[in-house]
Amino acid sequence: MSRATALVLICAALIGCERPGGPEQTRRLAGQALQGTLAYPRSTMVSVSAGEEAAQLVMSSPDSVTVVSKWFLRALAMNNWEVKRTLSDANGTVTIYAEQHKRPLWLTLRPNVGGPGTTYTMIGVVPTDSTKK
């Protein structure tokens, strides 16, 4: 193998190792997108994902969808979020849409399959000039 080929392979490997959107960036963007929100007490994080525009946090709780959704409706109102819409479907899923200073927040709460509890998803937008105070 020539030196040039080895150099190209090393550079390609180094570039491939530095991936944008690593865990640190995901946490930073999720923190920005979900700033001012609250997680239900005793929840466990399932996953977090984020891009430049939005972030999603999936959590699990041992409590029922009814209990968790009522808590969120109270907590959002107490923390200056305006609940715009709440929908429930026949499967027990509850969807809540709220805004705080033009910033949207979507919550989807689903009953766990095969056991008690709730899995909920929080989706927020990374603030821009139009969504900041």
Regions found by a protein language model. Name each.
Residues 1-15:
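Sec-dependent bacterial lipoprotein signal peptides
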Residues 17-133:
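An acidic-aromatic pocket/loop used at catalytic or ligand-binding sites
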